[in-house]
């Protein structure tokens, strides 16, 4: 079977341009390195270790990932460098993660990791130590320079598009980055890897948060944050159970509540519909469209726009308030320098403070911010 080629929308290759590829030991970065080599770039790999596990830790499996990354680089005939960003990760990603959970919010550490590690610390290391012209990652997004300024577009594979996780990039960072697999479907990426005999061709995609791995989330979090048990109440104020800590729950959560089979309730499942931090109460309601779970909009802060300007006030655009959510039509209204009010065209369920809201104009990722509070009216 013939090797599948990426489309011509990729950046024009130049033989004397050096690209440092973030080699994770997975299939996406493996194929990214192969495609860039095929396009004529000078390619070298860089493996990042971002978490210090002890000798008995089986969760992050950094040693296994490094072994796979080295095998791929050997197969492709390219050099592999290694770097330890564990200190930067702890200071800039993990401590933020803990602080947000302590405040009862639900953060997304992958977004902060991309901002602080993969496209900051990694880019600085590639520049200062490895003399890179570009960096490349195995993310499913695309880059376009048609407007005269680098823009980030959704990946071709809608199920794998990762623009949601990369909204904190600036157009300057996008202009220094290449995303070869963003032009392909995931199945095509695996096909290329298999055709080229890369050891990662059938390697399972990584899921979850790297520093937690296969451990139970509650067990991991309890080692860093003390549990604060409290009551579970219905939206009407009836106490129907207890929780071990608000940090273990998120809006829209259905499983793990331990409150099935309640008297005088219907057969609809129970959902987390609110977290009352001042009373340490977890509020639940029945049905995925419970009124307390719905919102007509939200306020967001910590804004970042890829073009450093942002859309016009009152712009009619779309937003995702969580990964793999369908686009939601909305209008955006500025509320000060670093805050926006976003109004949905139709009510949306389970919008969660602490999560990122990412805005789009058709295929273009405009940027986003952190959801601060909800509008229910």
Curated annotation (Swiss-Prot):
Q: Which UniProt keywords apply?
A: ATP-binding, Cytoplasm, Disulfide bond, Nucleotide-binding, RNA-binding, Transferase, tRNA processing, tRNA-binding
Q: Where is this site: Interaction with tRNA?
A: 139, 355
Question: A GO biological process this protein is involved in?
Answer: tRNA wobble position uridine thiolation
Q: What is its EC number?
A: 2.8.1.13
> In which compartments does the protein localize?
Cytoplasm
Could you tell me which InterPro entries the record lists for this protein? MnmA-like, MnmA-like_C, MnmA-like_central, MnmA-like_central_sf, Rossmann-like_a/b/a_fold
- Primary place of residence? cytoplasm
Which reaction equations make up its catalytic activity?
A: S-sulfanyl-L-cysteinyl-[protein] + uridine(34) in tRNA + AH2 + ATP = 2-thiouridine(34) in tRNA + L-cysteinyl-[protein] + A + AMP + diphosphate + H(+)
Active site annotation, chain numbering: 113 (nucleophile), 210 (cysteine persulfide intermediate)
Pfam families, A to Z:
tRNA_Me_trans, tRNA_Me_trans_C, tRNA_Me_trans_M
- Extract the ranges annotated as region (Interaction with target base in tRNA): 108-110
Q: Which GO terms describe its cellular component?
A: cytoplasm
Residue positions annotated to bind ATP are 22-29, 48, 138
Protein family: Belongs to the MnmA/TRMU family.
PANTHER family assigned: MITOCHONDRIAL TRNA-SPECIFIC 2-THIOURIDYLASE 1, TRNA 5-METHYLAMINOMETHYL-2-THIOURIDYLATE -METHYLTRANSFERASE
Q: What does this protein do?
A: Catalyzes the 2-thiolation of uridine at the wobble position (U34) of tRNA, leading to the formation of s(2)U34.
Name listed for the protein in its UniProt record: tRNA-specific 2-thiouridylase MnmA
What organism is listed for this UniProt entry?
A: Shewanella woodyi (strain ATCC 51908 / MS32)
Q: What is the lineage of its organism?
A: Bacteria, Pseudomonadati, Pseudomonadota, Gammaproteobacteria, Alteromonadales
């Amino acid at each position: 079977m013939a090797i599948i080629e990426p489309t011509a929308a990729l950046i024009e290759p130049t033989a004397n341009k050096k690209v440092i590829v973030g080699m994770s030991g997975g299939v996406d970065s493996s194929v990214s390195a192969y495609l860039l080599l095929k396009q004529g770039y000078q390619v070298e790999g860089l493996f990042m270790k971002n978490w210090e596990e002890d000798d008995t830790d089986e969760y992050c499996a950094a040693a296994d990932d490094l072994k796979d990354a080295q095998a791929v680089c050997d197969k492709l005939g390219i050099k592999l460098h290694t770097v330890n960003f564990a200190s930067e990760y702890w200071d800039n990603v993990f401590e933020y993660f803990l602080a947000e959970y302590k405040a009862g919010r639900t953060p997304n550490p992958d977004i902060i990791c991309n901002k602080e590690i993969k496209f900051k610390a990694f880019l600085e290391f590639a520049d200062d130590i490895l003399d890179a012209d570009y960096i490349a990652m195995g993310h499913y997004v695309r880059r376009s320079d048609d407007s005269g300024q680098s823009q980030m577009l959704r990946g071709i594979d809608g199920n794998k598009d990762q623009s949601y996780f990369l909204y904190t990039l600036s157009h300057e960072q996008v202009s220094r980055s290449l995303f070869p697999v963003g032009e392909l479907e995931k199945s095509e990426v695996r096909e290329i890897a298999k055709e080229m005999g890369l050891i990662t061709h059938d390697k399972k995609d990584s899921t979850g948060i790297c520093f937690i791995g296969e451990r139970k989330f509650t067990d991991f979090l309890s080692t860093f944050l003390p549990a604060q048990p409290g009551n579970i109440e219905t939206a009407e104020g009836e106490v129907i159970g207890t929780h071990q800590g608000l940090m273990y729950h998120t809006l829209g959560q259905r499983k793990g509540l331990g409150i099935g089979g309640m008297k005088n309730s219907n057969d609809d499942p129970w959902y987390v519909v609110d977290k009352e931090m001042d009373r340490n109460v977890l509020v639940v309601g029945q049905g995925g469209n419970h009124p307390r779970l719905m919102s007509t909009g939200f306020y967001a802060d910590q804004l970042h726009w890829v073009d450093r300007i942002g859309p016009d006030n009152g712009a009619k655009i779309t937003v995702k308030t969580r990964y793999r959510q369908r686009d939601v039509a909305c209008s955006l209204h500025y509320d000060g320098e670093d805050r926006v009010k976003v109004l949905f065209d139709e009510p949306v369920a389970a919008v969660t403070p602490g999560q990122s809201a990412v805005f789009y104009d058709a295929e273009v990722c405009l940027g986003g911010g952190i959801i601060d509070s909800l509008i229910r009216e």
